[in-house]
């Protein structure tokens, strides 16, 4: 047994970081890395024992439950015999879970890939922000290394010689780093010396090594930075096979609006640009991953003559606590003018002119200092003067003229109208196009608000379809790299202004606005946006189905489930499918060429799985029209049969849902909404791990029932049963009194936890004024599995 004062296995991420900070060590990295680093430091303090020596408190996944339960009990000796008894019960339960995972520990590369997909999908569904949340600064190994190079951490690691010696002692059979196919628990990832892990990644290329049959060691969790955009698209695609078919969204109410009024145009704006009912104020959506996106919109009318103006006020910088804020500007506004044919990213194209909150003017991605910075409650007046030799665009801040920002040749502009345009990043704005009786600040006498320009001198922006039956949605179907985006680009160019393209590329464009892209690259988080883009895209599709526009869904959409569930949202649209299925030789050439240019971003097992799931659409199901771009239906069907056979031979058989270890756990512990369970001992309460069945009689621990409301802990005698109401402890004395343990309330009477109890640690005082653990659980997002500030998209919100 270890004499280490800290049991690394039982620490949460925040506690691991705290211990590392006390020792002035780097607190960056995955949980396995933090455990590795802390254990090495503890061993060094205790006498320099190797970090991976069995029995020293490191993550030894072998052995029995009793061996694991004994580790780390010395620090709790002062808590009394009753505390030790409870800790043994917890450790024994953890031992059952770990042993259960070890039964399925040996897996091939394909199994490892499948497990990794499940972990990634689970993290996405639980709101994992990949290091972008305050207090959850778990960056990848790449950024951690960068921090160490800059002197921000003194990561202790084994020297190469020591790592090699430890590797030899463990034996070749235990050096495998593939992922286990067993159930993921708190101890699902094991540790390896940092030096050994780096050597494995260098030798293996993709960070994986082949496992031998019977190997019980679990692998190191592969950093997310190893994956490209295609991988996360594939993960999102797989979610549709597990999701229920959604109900068609409620159609937006038709609002009768005076079309002669100059206002923000609900058709000429981004889908995530939330416009108020009076159409004079707006903001960008900020819930979940939308906080990464910039949102823009134009006014309904433009001008090409005279001297006109409008006012814009920054009403709020919307708090986005779930977004990583260090060294990144998360609030920004650009205001100016653009052509109706320009994109919504103001300042990123030709004839798109913007003035930034940072005191910068931008056109065609070229930036230059201009004027001064502005902030909340500042009012910017935008002027356009068409009466001079060149068209002049200028600004004023709170009534103070800032001078001419842009000059445009009239010959180049060719009498095309300019429209008021705004681009927001986590900000809210409001406009005065002339509807106010009195402007925010006085304007020159020779200047006119755009609303007051005669209707015949104004130009109306493009209008969308009047009815849903006139709207069109085109779903692209094909393997990654088959040529879908190429077809979409060509088709959109042939029909300018008609389609809104929904694809990962377009989402990334709205994340990669000029300076923001550079900031993300400088902070080492650029690759994380690749994961966020597919997640945003799913929400975009839900919003799009409620808008009267024409859309192209530029995704793989190879599975029948994805096709059906997405098209079900667009009930009432003209639903079309475009299948891009080239010959196998052509497809291999295209993917090879793409890999040479962009790098290989999709694992081979993922491509094989998509080939096996590829299903051609049918007109009778959810499409009104199907177009085959290359191979026609008969030839494509033959090729798909070949792909399915190839996939079947290369991949292991898939496990059916709701089977395996999870099912056995459910049978043993009654896993349901009232009892989370775990092994033979019922350990859950009402959606919590504090449990109302832990071997004792119902109603004595956790859940709605208070632990101290009866004069007994669990009855008389015994030390825990197997779900039967046998007593666990003596009938008396009473152990909780008026204070309860794991009760429904968070405040009020002194209690041990809160409504959502999910912790193993214990406070300084058991049963009296120990609310810190419950509060920490709220902070760490255990309440309903989400961050307390996470905003989930729903139809009533937007």
Curated annotation (Swiss-Prot):
The modification Phosphoserine is found at residues 4, 58, 241, 245. Its main location: nucleus. The modification N6-acetyllysine is found at residues 17, 21, 179, 239, 326, 490, 498, 525, 539, 609, 787. The modification Phosphotyrosine is found at residue 240. The modification ADP-ribosylserine is found at residue 180. The modification Citrulline is found at residue 229. Residues 688-713 are annotated as: RNA-binding RGG-box. The modification Omega-N-methylarginine is found at residues 676, 707, 713. ATP binds at residues 478-485. Residues 71-80, 103-113, 153-169, 192-203 have a biased composition (Low complexity). Residues 8-42 form the SAP domain. Residues 624-651 form a coiled coil. Residues 585-600 are annotated as: Actin-binding. Residues 242-438 form the B30.2/SPRY domain. Residues 684-702, 713-723 have a biased composition (Gly residues). The modification Asymmetric dimethylarginine is found at residues 689, 694, 701, 707, 713, 728, 735. Residues 462-646 are annotated as: ATPase domain. GO terms for cellular component: catalytic step 2 spliceosome; cell surface; centrosome; CRD-mediated mRNA stability complex; cytoplasmic ribonucleoprotein granule; cytosol; dendrite; inactive sex chromosome. Residues 41-229, 645-727, 743-772 are annotated as: Disordered. Keywords: Acetylation, Activator, ADP-ribosylation, ATP-binding, Cell cycle, Cell division, Centromere, Chromatin regulator, Chromosome, Citrullination, Coiled coil, Cytoplasm, Cytoskeleton, Developmental protein, Differentiation, Isopeptide bond, Kinetochore, Methylation, Mitosis, mRNA processing, mRNA splicing, Nucleotide-binding, Nucleus, Phosphoprotein, Repressor, Ribonucleoprotein, Spliceosome, Transcription, Transcription regulation, Ubl conjugation. Cleaved at Asp-94 by CASP3 during T-cell apoptosis, resulting in a loss of DNA- and chromatin-binding activities. Extensively phosphorylated. Phosphorylated on Ser-58 by PLK1 and dephosphorylated by protein phosphatase 2A (PP2A) in mitosis. GO terms for biological process: adaptive thermogenesis; alternative mRNA splicing, via spliceosome; cardiac muscle cell development; cell division; cellular response to dexamethasone stimulus; cellular response to glucocorticoid stimulus; cellular response to leukemia inhibitory factor; circadian regulation of gene expression. Residues 114-128, 134-147 have a biased composition (Acidic residues). The modification Phosphothreonine is found at residues 260, 506, 556. PANTHER family: HETEROGENEOUS NUCLEAR RIBONUCLEOPROTEIN U, HETEROGENEOUS NUCLEAR RIBONUCLEOPROTEIN U FAMILY MEMBER. This is Heterogeneous nuclear ribonucleoprotein U. It comes from Rattus norvegicus (Rat).
């Amino acid at each position: 047994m270890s004499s280490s004062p800290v049991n690394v296995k039982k620490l949460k991420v925040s506690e691991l970081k705290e211990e590392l900070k006390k020792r002035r060590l780097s607190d960056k990295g995955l949980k396995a890395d933090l455990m590795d680093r802390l254990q090495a430091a503890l061993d060094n303090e205790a006498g320099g024992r190797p970090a991976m020596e069995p029995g020293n408190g490191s993550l030894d996944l072998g052995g029995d439950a009793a061996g694991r339960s004994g580790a780390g009990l010395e620090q709790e000796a002062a808590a009394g015999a009753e505390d030790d008894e409870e800790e043994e019960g917890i450790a024994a339960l953890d031992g059952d879970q770990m042993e259960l995972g070890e039964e399925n520990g040996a897996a091939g590369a394909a199994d490892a890939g499948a497990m990794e997909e499940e972990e990634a999908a689970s993290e996405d569904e639980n709101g994992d922000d990949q290091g972008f949340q305050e207090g959850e600064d778990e960056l990848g190994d790449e950024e951690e290394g960068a921090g160490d190079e800059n002197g921000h951490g003194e990561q202790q690691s084994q020297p190469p010689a020591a790592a090699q010696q430890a590797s030899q002692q463990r034996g070749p059979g235990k050096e495998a780093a593939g992922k286990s196919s067993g159930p993921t628990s708190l101890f699902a990832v094991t540790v390896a010396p940092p030096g050994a892990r780096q050597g494995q990644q260098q030798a293996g290329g993709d960070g994986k090594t082949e496992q031998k049959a019977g190997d019980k060691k679990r692998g190191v969790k592969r950093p997310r930075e190893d994956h490209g955009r295609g991988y996360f698209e594939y993960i999102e695609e797989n979610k549709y096979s597990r999701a229920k078919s959604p109900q068609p969204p409620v159609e937006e109410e038709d609002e009768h609006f005076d079309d002669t009024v100059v206002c923000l145009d609900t058709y000429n704006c981004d889908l995530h640009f939330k416009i108020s009912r009076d159409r004079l104020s707006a903001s960008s959506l900020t819930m979940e991953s939308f906080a990464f996106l910039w949102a823009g919109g134009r006014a309904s009318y433009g001008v090409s003559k005279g001297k006109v103006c409008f006012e814009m006020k920054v009403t709020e910088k919307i708090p986005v606590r779930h977004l990583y804020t260090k060294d990144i500007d998360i609030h920004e506004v650009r205001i100016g003018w653009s052509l109706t044919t320009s994109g919504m990213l103001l300042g990123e194209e030709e004839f798109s002119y913007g003035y930034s909150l940072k005191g910068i003017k931008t056109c065609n991605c070229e930036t230059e200092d201009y004027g001064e910075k502005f902030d909340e409650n500042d009012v910017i007046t935008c002027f356009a003067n068409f009466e001079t030799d060149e068209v002049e665009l200028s600004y004023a801040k709170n009534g103070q003229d800032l001078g001419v920002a842009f000059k445009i040749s009239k010959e180049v502009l060719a009498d095309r109208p300019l429209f008021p345009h705004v681009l927001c990043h986590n900000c809210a704005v409001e406009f005065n196009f002339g509807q106010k009786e009195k402007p925010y600040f006085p304007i020159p006498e020779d200047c006119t608000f755009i609303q007051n320009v005669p209707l015949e001198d104004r130009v109306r922006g493009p209008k969308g379809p009047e009815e849903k039956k006139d709207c069109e949605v085109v779903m692209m179907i094909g393997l990654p790299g088959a040529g879908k985006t190429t077809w979409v680009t060509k088709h959109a160019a042939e029909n300018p202004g008609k389609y809104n393209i929904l694809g990962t590329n377009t989402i990334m464009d709205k994340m990669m606005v000029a300076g923001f892209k550079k900031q993300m690259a400088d902070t080492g988080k650029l690759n994380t946006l690749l994961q966020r883009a597919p997640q945003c895209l799913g929400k975009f599709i839900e919003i799009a189905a409620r808008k009267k526009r024409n859309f192209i869904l530029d995704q793989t959409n190879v599975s029948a489930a994805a096709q059906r569930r997405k098209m079900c949202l667009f009930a009432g649209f003209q639903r079309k499918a475009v299948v891009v299925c080239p010959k196998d030789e052509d497809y291999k050439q295209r993917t090879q060429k793409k890999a040479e240019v962009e790098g290989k971003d999709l694992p081979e097992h993922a491509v094989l799985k998509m080939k096996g799931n590829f299903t051609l659409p049918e007109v009778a199901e959810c499409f009104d029209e199907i177009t085959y771009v290359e191979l026609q239906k008969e030839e494509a069907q033959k090729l798909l049969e070949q792909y399915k056979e190839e996939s079947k031979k290369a991949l292991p058989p898939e496990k059916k849902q709701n089977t395996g270890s999870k099912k056995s756990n459910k049978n043993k512990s009654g896993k349901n909404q009232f009892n989370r369970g775990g092994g033979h001992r019922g350990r859950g309460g009402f959606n919590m791990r504090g449990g109302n069945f832990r071997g004792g009689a119902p109603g004595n621990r956790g859940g709605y029932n208070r632990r101290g409301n009866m004069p007994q802990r669990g009855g008389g005698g015994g030390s825990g049963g197997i779900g039967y109401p046998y007593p666990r402890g003596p009938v008396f004395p009473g152990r909780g009194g008026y204070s309860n343990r794991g009760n429904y309330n968070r405040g009020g009477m002194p209690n041990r936890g809160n409504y959502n109890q999910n912790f193993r640690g214990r406070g300084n005082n058991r049963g009296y004024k120990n609310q810190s653990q419950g509060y920490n659980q709220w902070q760490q997002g255990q309440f309903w599995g989400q961050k307390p500030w996470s905003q989930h998209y729903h139809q009533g919100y937007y």
